[in-house]
Amino acid sequence: MLDSNLLRNEPDAVAEKLARRGFKLDVDKLRALEERRKVLQVNTENLQAERNSRSKSIGQAKARGEDIEPLRLEVNKLGEELDAAKAELDTLLAEIRDIALTIPNLPADEVPVGKDENDNVEVSRWGTPREFDFEIRDHVTLGEMHSGLDFAAAVKLTGSRFVVMKGQIARMHRALSQFMLDLHTEQHGYSENYVPYLVNHDTLYGTGQLPKFAGDLFHTRPLEEEADSSNYALIPTAEVPLTNLVRDEIIDEDQLPIKMTAHTPCFRSEAGSYGRDTRGLIRMHQFDKVEMVQIVRPEDSMAALEEMTGHAEKVLQLLGLPYRKIILCTGDMGFGACKTYDLEVWVPAQNTYREISSCSNVWDFQARRMQARCRSKSDKKTRLVHTLNGSGLAVGRTLVAVMENYQQADGRIEVPEVLRPYMNGLEYIG
């Protein structure tokens, strides 16, 4: 959520920045609502002051032995008018807040202006895509050869965009997540967390999934005996519960940065993705991811973004997977991001790079929703923290990249050296 003072005092400047990312801010409507808010605010305050004054007069009149009934009736009438004014003001403030919740974050000045993914800018590349002297098999074919990927069974159990993994393929999937967690906790300074896979609506508002992206989530219905409680939703990413751990907290600045990681399944409806990536593991309703989250001082967030992106890159480098680093243009960034790097791994069967990590600086956008603040020891003042999140990495897509990049002519899959300790020294699958 953007700073309400910024929206109130600099709507034209805000609108210009939002236009860079393709969002049209209705400045005239905001101004009209703000003018109405001022009128209602003054009216409410005047009524409050008048009622307080008249209430005080009742006591004074009573002390003088005067008839207080006319004053009492007047105070009651003022109270009714005040209640009505407060209700009208609350309704208007709710309307303003509802609008504010739909406004995306402002892009950082250095983010390239563009409309969509075609305007993203490549920053760097690492590694050279392997040249094969045999016909490349995709991960689906390789998985079926080794009885490791069973999409038909998943369709029977659930439906499309799910998978059943078996045997050594399932083991490699587990090995990848363990390797990522160990790297981030032992070398990159993150603390490991186990978090709920179901979260409440306050949590989803905190990180910006609600209200705008309700259709992208899998929602649950309450049990009959809990019908009065709020519904839950399955997490689309561990960013949601991890970041919300600091909701409504005031953190001493000497405790920052807070660096957290978690391995969780992620659940997404993939609304709007009909017909895209229908084969294989690239786009699933359920997939695993190792997430990184940092909570930092405002002045440290841009440096933290570079660091976090480097942590994701290190996973790919140790696995020996060629990738490129992209800075997303204004039109392709996520709703809450002010700056985002994507890492795209080389997928041989598609002869292209595919996204495997997205690392974003969210600035104070989530912190304002969550009321997550930090406090300096020197002056005891509080200010909003900055939050960052990044994939470190998407486990299923990493499995795809390993299977395809490490395939052999006979269909075997070489196990990357860094994964062998997690697979009992196994060198090849098959």
UniProtKB/Swiss-Prot annotation:
Pathway assigned in UniProt: Aminoacyl-tRNA biosynthesis; selenocysteinyl-tRNA(Sec) biosynthesis; L-seryl-tRNA(Sec) from L-serine and tRNA(Sec): step 1/1
Molecular function GO terms recorded: ATP binding; serine-tRNA ligase activity
Binding-site residues for L-serine, renumbered to this chain: T237, A238, E239, E291, S391
Keywords: Aminoacyl-tRNA synthetase, ATP-binding, Cytoplasm, Ligase, Nucleotide-binding, Protein biosynthesis
Primary localization class, coarse: cytoplasm
Lineage: superkingdom: Bacteria
E.C. designation(s): 6.1.1.11
Compartment(s): Cytoplasm
Function, as annotated: Catalyzes the attachment of serine to tRNA(Ser). Is also able to aminoacylate tRNA(Sec) with serine, to form the misacylated tRNA L-seryl-tRNA(Sec), which will be further converted into selenocysteinyl-tRNA(Sec).
Comment block on domains: Consists of two distinct domains, a catalytic core and a N-terminal extension that is involved in tRNA binding.
Protein name, as recorded: Serine--tRNA ligase
